[in-house]
């Protein structure tokens, strides 16, 4: 085992291709241990603080179960039940919380919040989701693709839907891991250039036609049309995105062995047809489970280094 200095995971670009190669293989090993009921407690007596400003099912469950399976335990905090919701400065909260725990996961709104927190933390901080990025989910998605089809390098991932935190994280992943990213969204919901790194220009292709975006894709993926915090726009978004539902016709334009993914929760009949998400090309349940395994690998790496 090798040690590593304090490292945060705030966006996908925070790690190198070499680190991702290690993490993805480590997730495979930890998943095998989980399936074989092997005890592995490298984080014995370590504490994870989970801070939630946004509600969650999969994020809380996967992190809480994951730290337990690694021998540690979790403490849940939300803004309703802590001083974070009563105006305590983020910098002060980071100083205090990071003196009492070993690692911190935050699910919040603006990326600036988690960046400020990490800047004053004495322990690793993990992005459990922000408005801008969702790195743990895309890490799970990449792992799922590799598990099902092998290397993602040189492949094409098609994103059909909103320019949200998942889309921006996929762009970073394409740059880091060497695949092409097709993006298609209706007018008015295009990518923010400020969140698209110049280094990813060679991997990104933008399409007006979602069918065209799916052509040649090895993976087609999407997300809800209305993310948390944008509920007031829901009806307008439904009208704008009605031609951006992932359909069997879109999957037929992709590669014959293409997969479908969705980070969940899904709305059948909106961003995806039931026939697609419940069909043979969908791997959404493996994708959801794999949050557990990649996050275990991530926490182990941030606290213990490489094994």
UniProtKB/Swiss-Prot annotation:
Catalytic activity, as annotated: carbamoyl phosphate + L-ornithine = L-citrulline + phosphate + H(+)
The keyword Transferase appears for this protein: yes
Enzyme class: transferase
Biological process according to GO: arginine biosynthetic process via ornithine; citrulline biosynthetic process; L-arginine biosynthetic process
Residue sites binding carbamoyl phosphate per the record: 56-59, 83, 107, 134-137, 263-264, 291
Any one Pfam family match given in the protein's UniProt record, by short name: OTCace
Role, per record: Reversibly catalyzes the transfer of the carbamoyl group from carbamoyl phosphate (CP) to the N(epsilon) atom of ornithine (ORN) to produce L-citrulline.
PANTHER family xrefs: ORNITHINE CARBAMOYLTRANSFERASE, MITOCHONDRIAL, ORNITHINE TRANSCARBAMYLASE, MITOCHONDRIAL
Protein name: Ornithine carbamoyltransferase
């Amino acid at each position: 085992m090798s040690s590593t200095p304090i490292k945060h995971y705030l966006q996908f670009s925070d790690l190198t291709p070499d680190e991702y190669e290690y993490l993805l293989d480590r997730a495979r090993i930890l998943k095998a241990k989980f399936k074989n009921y092997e005890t592995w407690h490298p984080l014995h007596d370590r504490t994870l603080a989970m801070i939630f400003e946004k509600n969650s099912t999969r994020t809380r469950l996967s992190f809480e179960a994951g730290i337990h399976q690694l021998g540690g335990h979790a403490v849940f905090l939300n803004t309703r039940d802590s001083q974070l919701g009563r105006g305590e400065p983020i910098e002060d909260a980071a100083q205090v919380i990071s003196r009492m725990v070993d690692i911190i996961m935050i699910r919040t709104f603006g990326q600036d919040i988690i960046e400020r927190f990490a800047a004053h933390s004495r322990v690793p901080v993990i992005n459990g989701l922000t408005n801008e990025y969702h790195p743990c989910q895309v890490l799970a998605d990449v792992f799922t693709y590799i598990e099902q089809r092998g290397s993602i390098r040189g492949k094409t991932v098609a994103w059909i839907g909103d320019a949200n935190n998942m889309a921006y994280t996929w762009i970073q992943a394409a740059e880091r891991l060497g695949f092409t990213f097709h993006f298609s969204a209706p007018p008015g919901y295009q990518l923010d250039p400020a969140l698209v790194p110049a280094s990813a220009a060679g991997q990104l292709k933008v399409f007006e036609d979602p069918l065209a975006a799916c052509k040649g894709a090895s993976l087609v993926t999407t997300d809800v049309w209305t993310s948390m915090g944008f509920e007031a726009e829901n009806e307008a978004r439904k009208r704008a995105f009605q031609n951006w539902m992932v359909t069997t016709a879109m999957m037929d334009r992709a590669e014959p062995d293409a997969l479908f993914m969705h980070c969940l929760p899904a709305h059948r009949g909106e961003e995806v047809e039931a026939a697609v998400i419940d069909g043979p090309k969908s791997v959404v349940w493996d994708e959801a489970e794999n949050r557990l395994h990649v996050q275990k690998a991530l926490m182990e790496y941030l606290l213990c280094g490489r094994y």
